[in-house]
Design a protein with these regions (language model features):
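Glycosyltransferase catalytic domains, chiefly GT-A lineage
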Residues: 1-199
């Protein structure tokens, strides 16, 4: 059997249809896909439990939460709270489930081909973290977009279970817990300085 390709995602009932389509497209594109799903409410957990797909491992909301997150949840909207949880979800997959590598994917993506080509490129270059840049044009307008939306798009990013990767992941997690709003483009703006790291 081939080595599994580990992914994680999160969504609530408002994104359930998109999440199901994303996961179906991912499994069709990468038959080794194994997806950890943080179920942001019981509707998602119940649906995925009934779905009973061997490519999916559910993480219940109650299993994931702690006192800090419960307190933050009261202060943030649904979208902001989902953004808050992204970095921690990746860390949980790496540390609790002992996966060697994990790629976070947004629930509203659709895969037409195997995304492991990106992960394989990362491995080939001996990198431990991969984030996808927006690739705004090097123009006045492009630079303005980078300032407004951040340099990177966090819809698909990969971390290995290595110390420098975990350190950056923890830094991202702390930033998201401190503030995660439209002003920071959710969890996205915090990744803009990642280009200065080389590992």
């Amino acid at each position: 059997m081939s080595e599994k390709s580990v992914y994680c995602t999160l969504f609530d009932k408002n994104y359930l249809d998109k999440g199901l389509v994303m996961m179906e497209s991912l499994v069709n594109a990468d038959q080794n896909a194994f997806i950890y799903v943080l179920c942001m409410d019981d509707t998602v957990l119940d649906c995925l439990t009934k779905y009973n797909n061997s490519h999916i491992h559910t993480i219940s909301f109650s299993e994931f939460m702690d006192e800090e997150l419960l307190e933050i949840k009261e202060e943030r909207g649904n979208a902001e709270f989902c953004w808050t949880c992204t970095a921690r979800l990746v860390r949980v997959v790496l540390e609790k489930f002992k996966e060697p590598i994990c790629t976070y994917v947004d629930a509203d993506l659709y895969f037409y081909s195997n995304p492991q080509v990106l992960v394989n490129e990362m491995k080939k270059n001996n990198c431990t973290v991969q984030v996808i840049p927006h690739q705004f044009p090097d123009t006045k307008e492009g630079r303005l977009q980078g300032k407004l939306y951040g340099l990177n798009c966090v819809q698909f990013n990969t971390f290995t279970n290595e110390q420098n990767s975990l350190d950056l992941l923890k830094k991202w997690e702390v930033a998201c817990i401190t503030e995660c709003s439209k002003e920071t483009v959710g969890d996205q703006m915090f990744t803009s300085d990642w280009g200065k790291y080389s590992f």
